[in-house]
Amino acid sequence: MPKKAVRPMPYAVSEHTKAMLCQALKKKMAQKSLDKITIRELADDCGLKRQAFYYHFQDIYDLVRWMFQQEAVSLLRQHDGALLWQEGLLQLLRYIEENRAVCRCALQSLGRSYISMFFRDDIHAIIHRTVDELHRQVHFLQAPGQGELLTQFYVIALAGVVESWVLEELKCSAEELVDFIDQLLTDQLRGAIDRQKEESLRLNRPQGGLAT
């Protein structure tokens, strides 16, 4: 006798179940390291069978990935205009501030490279748009690939600053950190623009006086 096909779970029910597992995970991450959390205890906390977890996620790391994509990365994507990157970053930092124990647990359990992969593409896109927009206005980039080099520099620097802030090595508010990053980025790009202007003036300056 042929086996009955497994009926797909309704979307709303599936999303509700994933949200329940996410909240259970956040509760546990505030108490202990990720490697001490089991799928069984997450399922038990949600009143689910262990198999229900595997219907939605491959493992706990897959649940962590979904959690950050749903709750944190989406904040950046809501503010992806070139003029709104500061607001997107501020919303992300406020999320981290509200979930600092969870983010610290993820950072310490998984490492910077694993966590940054969730945000790298979005932060890269935000900074790259800012650099491109300034270049369109004043043409300060002097060589092919210079914009990407500058973008990568700021992405790596920003990741390090945010990591230190998550670990509370930096004592400042989310607003103060965004203001600092904004000012640093603005000053550095303004310096590049000023150098480009000086170079243009030097190249266009007449060499010597007119012969008599």
Predicted stretch roles:
Residues M1-K32, K36-T212:
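Alpha-helical bundle regulatory/interaction domains
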